[in-house]
């Protein structure tokens, strides 16, 4: 229940205010309040974002109720989504009615259960109450006659921002005006070199820069500017002063700050992320709240005497009565003849069995149906076969759901074994491309890099390459500067019009050819030299982390990753380490289609480093001493899986043995067929696409190069499960590109350490991806990022709708919906399936408190495939 926007004249009582707040305490309040938002990475390094990561100590149901209460955000699937899933046959209604019976068993009532059950079953149809019934004079008269039924009133337990309770004389909520101002200042401060003029005094901090400029802001009234001019110069003091002026009691400060953070969770999220990146900005979130709440005081100050913070909201009787008449077959006359006690009980049942609970029961049945069908698919394909198959090549892919169809097609095409592992390949590294001083943390975002790896070339080749790259960069930079300059922007259309006009025509009508031409032209011009890596340990004066690895670290990382892959024996002549990347044009969300395990970057860099390490004689000697013997004729190579076009690009091929060369030739021979089949399967799932494609590969390339294409691929939509086990468990299953697949052999993991590492790393990445897609589907207006066609890239950080919206944090509408009315992504919580004996799962849950909390509180689902008892839900 959201707070009413009606303002009463009852002032907040003075005795409720206890502003004995020390400035040093305010940071503790801010830190505690930050649990309600999640860090938001810049869109150029888009990383999956679990919106409720700080709330996992509460159950999913509690968080759903809380969000509905304080923000009116519903995070259960809508009735239309449930109806669509039912039409598609994705919900077994036996699970629905089993859930209903469990709910009825948990309730206590004094009327016949059969009567309640009939009502509930009818209400589960999720049809709307007829409007003529809700508006009927007889029903409203009956509601007025029922006395003392709705005796319970609900006091709002969280302090809403005062600005959200007030409207100005133009009937505009003051919260909207406040948001407009805060967005403006956030864009100015956080701008990542997109604008030509930087915010003055930005280097001194957000609050200081704002305080310096606010007295000149023409969007504020003269009185507001004067009041803020005399405001404290320190952010902590300003925040304490604002809370005191607004008369927020100390016991409500945290919830009041939470309300403000949830008002613009995108901007607050990227500020939270920035605060964790450097010591200099560690208090940035406090500064943000100081700016926001100081401005709130200035805007609402004339209205403060009118605000009532303790609003109560009564439950409306009319829809409860209507529900029993519509679904319970009770007439108004029968209602009139009931005793007050019976009326109260029926209304209480209707109140508790509300639409949110009904949709929750359907949603849980949807999840149970998915789990049941997945278990049937897996168990029905199991057979005992101890015969070792001949394997010509082993190919390790990222666990990404887009790898599953490609791996399936590869295995059908030849004697190949595919392996699933997180696409950073166990290397906790930050990577620096050739000639770049910038490094990118190429590992899951919840981890920190321990080593920096630089791409190297000879001095002469590097110098020549950097010169060509500088020319390439200068052209685009000059164009940008001319476009933003007051004078040259007038001349630019005349100079560039003919060229840009031709480019527009070519981009629109022959996108594949033009894209290929531009890419080849740039590649020819840059002529990137052959490179190597700084793999050997060296102290880095530019960074806190060292360059390269020691000999022991090289051996340890390779050993750990090979064990995670379950690849410690029976090596094929060729082992291919496959990272993955995407390809799209005019797409701000390009990084969202890259490797999540590599922090939103392509995985080829990590793949090449790992393959190189595996080929080093010193590493092989170290592995051999620990019992992992790699044959001399086994060679590790690296490739990159292009998910948008389902092709494999070789990025590292060392000198090959004869058997490895044979394997490579075989892979290259079957790759066109594999790509054709994988593209055909994937493209058929795109909306409004022809069912018969003459050339799927050509169509896939057109999607990748077309600058008007809002959906070059589905990304990780429809992800629903994370399966940890041997490939034989799922090899004969068509998992429809919905499963993250990670290899695991419990027989080689007596201690359980490997399983714990998989859950803590890749398992967490998969959960974050799953919940980001979930949130963007069920609450796109709050957790999604809107329509790609109307987005505005702002401040070099992310996207907005228009020029004054929240910084949008989720995936776009086109990534989860196949039409305006039909969702493509199924909003189901991630089902983690572990192939291991039950005692392994019990040990994992006992040792890993965080994971146990996720399972117990309903943030993930858990099942296991026990070699003795089969499938088991936990």
Swiss-Prot record:
Q: Specify which residues bind Zn(2+) according to the UniProt entry for this protein.
A: 398, 400, 580, 595
Query: Under the cellular component aspect of Gene Ontology, which terms does the record hold?
Result: plasma membrane
Entry superkingdom: Bacteria
Q: Which GO terms describe its molecular function?
A: zinc ion binding
Which positions, given as ranges, span the membrane? none
The UniProt entry lists membrane topology as: Peripheral membrane protein
Q: What is its main location?
A: membrane
InterPro entries with a match to the protein in the record: DabA (IPR018752)
Cofactor(s) this protein cannot do without? Zn(2+)
Q: Which Pfam families match?
A: DabA
According to its UniProt record, where is this protein located?
Cell membrane
Keywords in alphabetical order, please. Answer: Cell membrane, Membrane, Metal-binding, Transport, Zinc
What does this protein's UniProt record list under function?
Part of an energy-coupled inorganic carbon pump.
- Subunit annotation: Forms a complex with DabB.
What family is reported?
Answer: Belongs to the inorganic carbon transporter (TC 9.A.2) DabA family.
Return the protein name. Answer: Probable inorganic carbon transporter subunit DabA
Q: Which organism is it from?
A: Bacillus cytotoxicus (strain DSM 22905 / CIP 110041 / 391-98 / NVH 391-98)
